[in-house]
Amino acid sequence: MEHGSYEHSCGCVPGKGTDGARKVIKRWVVNDPKGTSKVAVLDVKQCYPTLPHEQLRLKLEKRIKDRKFLRLAFKIIASYQQAMANKTQLLPETIAVGIPVGLYTSPWFLNFFFQDLDHLIAEKCGLSHLVRYVDDMVLFDNSKKRLHAAIRTVGDYLQHMQMRLKSTWQVYHLRIRPLDFLGFKFHANGKITLRKSILYRISRKARTIARKGYASVTNASGMISYKGYMDHSDSSGFYEKWVQPFINFKVLKGVVSNENRKQCKALCAA
């Protein structure tokens, strides 16, 4: 399903993900400041609940010829529709919509479904700087006119697929306002910071652990995840002031490691 996918489609793709999106955006902003001077941020409205089954099946049949794979994929697609979540009458598969959030195959189906859209933006709209994370898209260019044309193209494509673009899309100058994407803020000078809400949650969790004198598995694993955010952004000043005095990450890793060993022993005993 990855064959033919757009290079910078990063959501839930092994080796890419959030870190892959962060790296490529920073590289573009630093190496091509003119070509990334304007940015468009947009996403699909209720992407998972509105994905049309018939269109997804047609795309799979067109690209993949392995009948065994297709039979399995079609069974997975038909096993759920949004009417189940809404507790309403089930629809015929030809007009059914929706794939379940959290199912392993769902982000793969979404990434595959939007492959054509990725190439359409790059080829028809002439934009070379596009990152998509599942249903969230970021487009860069030096022309607001081209970005608005690309947004219209995306909207028309989604309408053809019986889906919709959220009305909250934005186009703006990167030097005036940083790009807020995936928890990071990308500045025109190449600097990467974290959202204030994330910084607040990090400092609050650090103080909570310090006040209690111990860390639960949940708090320990959460704090370790936040450490990854700080390591991949320009947050050294924040870390030194609000985290380092309160947290010993070796101890937190020990807490998580001990819990993993307990779970492994329990599984082996069963």
Write out the residue ranges for each language-model feature:
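Short glycine-rich loop/turn motifs that provide flexible caps or phosphate-binding loops at active sites
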Residues: 10, 14, 97, 101, ...
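Long, hydrophobic, well-ordered secondary-structure blocks that form the structural core
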Residues: 11-22, 41
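Conserved polymerase palm-domain catalytic core
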Residues: 26-134, 138-153, 173, 229, ...
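Electropositive, glycine- and tryptophan-enriched low-complexity nucleic-acid-binding patches
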Residues: 1-10
